[in-house]
Amino acid sequence: MPTLLYLHGFNSSPESKKALQTEQWFANYAPDIEFVCPQLPPFANQAMALLSRLIEQRLPDPVYLVGSSMGGFLATCLVERYGLKAVLINPAVSPHRGLEDWLGENANYQTGETWRFEPEHIDEYKQWDPTAIK
C-alpha cells in the first residue's frame, strides 16, 4: 500500500490545521493511500531516526512525503537519502541559521510537551543540511 508521510513544522504537531486538512483530503479522495503524520521531536537526529524507521518499514512500497516548514527541510534530507518524491510547503532552508531564538526551555504550543534546546541541537540541523539535491 502506498504511504503519504506528512511532516509538520518545528514545534508543531499532527494536530496542526494543515496536517488535519491533508489527512481529511486523503481519507475522502485517496483512501487507498496510508496517511501517516508522526509527532516529530524538535531535534534533527531524533526526527530523522524516527522518519527513517517509518520509511524503511514501508519500503519497497511507495512512500511519498509532504513537508511543511521544518518538515520540508526534513523531507529534503529524506529525498536525498531514499530517492523519494516530496511536496514541500514553505520549506525551511539551512534552518540552523535561525534556531538560536529557541535555545533554552520551550513548550509545544499544541501538545504542551516541554523540551530544552541546546547549541548541540542547532549543530544537528547544520549536519543534516543537504549540499546537493539530486
PLM ranges: what are they?
Residues 3, 62-64, 85:
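Structural motif
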Residues 49-54, 73, 122-131:
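A generic local structural motif
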Residues 65-75:
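Gly/Ala-rich beta-loop-alpha elbow adjacent to hydrolase catalytic centers
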Residues 84-134:
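The alpha/beta-hydrolase serine catalytic core
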